[in-house]
């Protein structure tokens, strides 16, 4: 079986709805909602309601990697992201 990877370019004016973001990150919609509820993910202010851009796509993927690589809960990931965002690590 031949595996072919594909991708989609997300432009500045392109938005992903909640379901598409979850699918692109290989997570459940409920997981993305949890990230929003916990304050780890926010839709950009200029985006339509519950729509996300490329930066948010990358953030969800980063959160999943941190959880997996460090076996971390969301509270620990929040601290890690604060340090990463502040360029302290």
Whereabouts are the PLM-identified features?
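Arg/Lys-rich, alpha-helical DNA-contact motif
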Residues: 2-25, 29-33, 37-89
């Amino acid at each position: 079986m031949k595996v072919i990877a594909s991708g989609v370019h997300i432009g500045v004016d392109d938005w992903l709805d909640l379901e598409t973001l979850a699918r692109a990150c290989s997570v459940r919609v409920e997981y993305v909602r949890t990230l929003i509820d916990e304050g780890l993910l926010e839709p950009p202010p200029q985006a339509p309601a519950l729509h996300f851009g490329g930066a948010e796509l990358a953030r969800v993927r980063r959160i999943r990697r941190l959880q997996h690589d460090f076996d971390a809960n969301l509270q620990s990931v929040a601290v890690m992201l604060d340090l990463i965002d502040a360029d302290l690590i």
